[in-house]
Structure formats: C-alpha cells, structure tokens
Amino acid sequence: MLKKERQAYIIQQINIHNKVLSSDLSTQLNVSEDTVRRDLQELSEEGKLIKVHGGALSKSFHFTIQNENIYLLPEKKIIAHKAISLIKDGMFVLLSGGTTIRELVKSLPPKLNATFITVSVPTALELLNHPNSEIIFLGNKLSKNAQMAVGAEVVQRLNEIKADLCFLGTNSFDANEGVTDLEWDVIEVKKAMIRAAHKTVSLSISEKLNTVQRLLVCKPEEIDILITELEPDNETLQAYRDKGITVL
C-alpha cells in the first residue's frame, strides 16, 4: 500500500472513531509501527490530526482546537435532534463525551428544565450555555485523550446516582459484540454510567456500526435505544432491532 493510501485510511479511521492506536493501525495496514508513527507525525505536521502517545486523536474531538470541520456534522445534527425528543422536563440525564453529544447539548431547547450529569469537560462547558438546566460535573482525575473524568471516585459517585437516561457517545457498536472502546479508564466510567441509568441510549453515526474495538463497554442487550442518522427501517439496523433494541 502506498503512503498516500495508508494516510487516507488513517484519516478515515480517525474521522469515524475519533481516536486510533498505532498498534491497531500497524495490524490493519500490515506495516511496522515505526511506519505508522512516521505517518502520524506527518499528518500531525499537516494539521490533519493530533498525535498523542500510542496513537492519534481527531482535531474535531479535541475541544481546545478551534475547528469547524467536524466529521459528518449534518448526520450528527440529525442524531442530536432525534435524541432531544427523549428528554423531558424534570429528568436526570447522564451525558458522556464526543462530538455527537456536544451537538445534542447545543440543540437543547432553551426552556427545557432538566438536570444533566456529565463526566466530560467539553460537554460540561457546552452545558454552561443552557439557561434553564442544572449541571453536575463529576470531576476527578482527567483523561487527557478523552477529556473526561475517570477513576474510582467517579465510578463510586455514579454508583450512587439513579438517572432517567444515559446518552452514550459511541466509538464502535456491533450487533453481536456490543459497544466497544479503546481506553480502559474510560470504559469503566461508561459501564458505571450504564448501571446508573434506567435507560441507555447509544448515539452513533452509521459508519461506527458493525465495527469492533479492543475493549468491551457493554453487551448489545444493555443498550435500550440506538439513534443513528438513518431512517429507523433501514436494513443496516435490522441486526440491532433483532437484539430487542429500539431504533430511532
């Protein structure tokens, strides 16, 4: 595979999943990790991604970077507007992080009066712009890559919460394997969020469906509702409906 083709693949993967590991790319591309690191360094110098230890992050995922080029933004807006229909006045709502969650928060009706609990720094900052909702940030140790609070204290606080809904930003979701991700600390927090909620809603662009990462967040049966940009009767979603998941 030519360098141009490798780098195009890397950009595609980072756009879909927001973050990539050098070791995974090495396996997928059948090249050495040194080659992958050189590609990531070059793409970083071109301003196309953020190189971090062990991999890279999407620039649109990193809220400190001023970048309006969010991948598949129209599709994420569709997902956000579908999700808003589930939120009612008086609800306690858990929010993870990610660009789709941020679009959800940006689209909240100004008159909505709900309590939002989040572990995500960008999500909390976006919620500050909402006039009528209470914000609870569960802070502790921060994951620089995910820009969210992680650790035993956060998990313990989540264990004491009984929320109506949990909106989960999704890295990968396969109808057989479930929701998967890359970072252990982040996964432990997401598991606690799912346990803390009466219903869990996965927000996912369709490109993240039928993909699998290294670490399990939850089995498919633990997701109550899946929201994508697709029409609910799209055949791509049939496998998820077969698992008893409500598809919006």
List PLM regions with ranges.
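Conserved phosphate- and dinucleotide-binding cores of soluble alpha/beta proteins
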Residues: 2-5, 12, 22-23, 125-248
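HTH-adjacent hinge/linker in prokaryotic transcriptional regulators
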Residues: 2-9, 15-23, 27-28, 34-99, ...
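Aromatic-residue hotspot detector
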Residues: 28-29, 167
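Short, charged low-complexity intrinsically disordered segments located at boundaries
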Residues: 39-44, 71, 114-116, 155-156, ...
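Short, intrinsically disordered/low-complexity patches at protein termini
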Residues: 45, 74-75, 118-119, 148-149, ...
